[in-house]
A protein has these predicted regions:
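Short acidic/histidine-rich motifs immediately flanking catalytic phosphotransfer sites
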Residues: 50, 70-74
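Short, conserved active-site loop motifs that form the nucleotide-linked donor/cofactor pocket
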Residues: 51-52, 145
Length: 210
């Protein structure tokens, strides 16, 4: 049974947001509201059938974000760099500004560390560095926020980097290369982490979970 706390999930039809929405729904403790540009999509309909409230909205429209956040206790947000590229920062800033204007009690924001800063300027990873810039902006607003930094998705081996069958019948992965170590996560499990944060937000305030 829910405790009437409404959590808005941004990006609920994507890999991260979908897992978060499903875990929140399965916990039975929250009312889950999912923002999507296309409420009639197959994934949006599946979320609605699972018990979520699905609303139409767009990162590019600040007012639509604020409308979706009305009455919400918390927000989970992620901005997909690979979908938005050079608009990622602008759209992410819209999201953060909407949270700041909406009396949200706790914000969970999926970001990434600053590769350029960590490497002393030797390495630039655009999708990391833009997300880190969004995190820096968010910290400056004094919000009740927790940052989550998910690792490489194991699910990528089922899509972007599938194993290739060799002549001897075995399968080989082409990534990572050589002896390189690769941290990974089943992205569905991120939902469990985010649900735990919303269950005990004071324990995770201003923290970064990697």
């Amino acid at each position: 049974m829910t405790d009437d706390k409404v959590i808005l999930v941004i990006g609920a039809t994507g890999a991260q947001g979908g897992g978060v929405a499903r875990h929140l729904l399965n916990s039975g403790r929250f009312t889950v509201r999912c923002l999507t540009r296309n409420p009639s999509s197959e994934k949006a309909i599946a979320l609605q059938e699972a018990g979520a409230e699905v609303v139409k909205g767009d990162f590019g429209e600040l007012e639509s974000l604020k409308t979706a956040m009305k009455g919400c206790y918390g927000v989970f947000g992620v901005v997909n760099f690979w979908e938005h590229f050079d608009k990622t920062y602008e759209l992410g800033k819209n999201l953060v500004d909407a949270v700041a204007a909406s009396n949200i009690k706790h914000f969970v924001f999926s970001t990434l560390p600053n590769a350029k800063k960590i490497s002393g300027g030797k390495i630039e990873v655009p999708h990391f560095d833009i997300q880190a810039k969004l995190e820096e902006y968010t910290r400056g607003l004094g919000l009740n926020v927790t940052f989550v930094n998910p690792a490489f998705y194991f699910e990528n081996f089922l899509s972007y980097f599938p194993p290739k069958k060799q002549e001897d019948g075995t399968f080989a992965f082409g990534f990572p290369q050589g002896d390189t170590l690769l941290a990974g996560v089943a992205i569905e499990d991120l939902g469990g982490v985010v649900t735990a944060i919303f269950n005990k937000p004071d324990d995770f305030k201003d923290k970064q979970l990697v």
